[in-house]
Amino acid sequence: LGGEGMGYYMTAYSIFNPICALCVAGFPVAVSRLTAASLANHRREEPRRILTVALLLFLPMGLLCSAGIYLAAPFFVRIVGNEAALGAVRAIAPAVFFCCISAVFRGYYEGGRNMVPTAVSQVVEASVKLGAGILCAMHCLETELGHFTAGEPVCGVTVSSLEEAQMVIAPYAAAAAIIGVTVSTLAGCLALALAYFGEPHTGSDRIGAAGMIHYSKNLLVTALPVCAGALVVNLSSFVDLMSVINRLNYAVSLGWEALCRSHPQAGLERMEAERVGNFLFGSYSGLAMTIFHLVPAITASLGVCALPLIASLAARGSRAQLRRTVESVLRITVIVALPLGLGMSCMAGQILQLLFSSNPEEV
């Protein structure tokens, strides 16, 4: 996609992440915590009932948020100053709904200390995201460049040069790549659903009105604080999106030549001024931030694995063992994160050149 295409791609992701965090972040934690507590107290029937209530409670929320992203997409892209990203934002909207379903199933399995379905679904999701995203983007690029070679309009626009054709294609290619992301969330959701419905279940998951209210209250009490915390963290990317592109465009309007001299390797002088802000944002978010998120992804898995054990110990009142477990998790997190963070700081250039050698302008 290059820096420009990544700008459109990451614009969609930066809008998607805080809304997805608001809808999804607390679901697996709440379901996992309640499931682990039920199993610790030998209430074997409760986990399926918790899952049923969670699905009934959270799926409408995911559907509403998906519809909200799709309908509000023109407003979002206008306030961030990147209106060409409209297609990418709308393409990622259904992913919120699929993520809600996946989050509930993952919480159910993680609460029972069965990480296999979660791991399988994440492998499926990552594989489909890579394959479908690349295939969709390549199909879009090859088709439209073929139209340019044949002298036909590119994406409905008549162009006179290859650079102009690539500029016109970039937002459509980014939207095509985002379709791969949405398809991958559907694939991960199906993997979890198949795992659940493919295993034997004993007992009934029927639940009365009183039980529905009881479980709903417990789920919301646990989920909402986690969702709020995740929203605050992810809002930083949305604030970046609103401020960075607009500030970069303002900097270009003030000192185009100085900006070109400060980044000679990026080839900014060959671009139109209105494209530079999106290109630089794509380089920042698509390359630098991608590397940055590797460390939190590793450490977050420690918390996911530890949560069922912590909830089980809390339910049994084992405070001493609970404290030792939390200290162990924090210790391992520091041991992993500190050297990785220092290494990334000291070798940032070499890491980017190694992983993105085909994108020297963006590096």
Where are these predicted regions, by residue range?
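Interfacial/gating helices of multi-pass transporter permease domains
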Residues: 1-18, 170-175, 214-222, 245-293, ...
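Signature of the first transmembrane helix
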Residues: 1-29, 66, 70, 96, ...
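Helix-loop junctions and terminal segments of transmembrane helices
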Residues: 25-40, 299-316
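Interhelical loop/hinge segments that connect adjacent transmembrane helices in multipass membrane
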Residues: 148-178, 190-233, 251-254
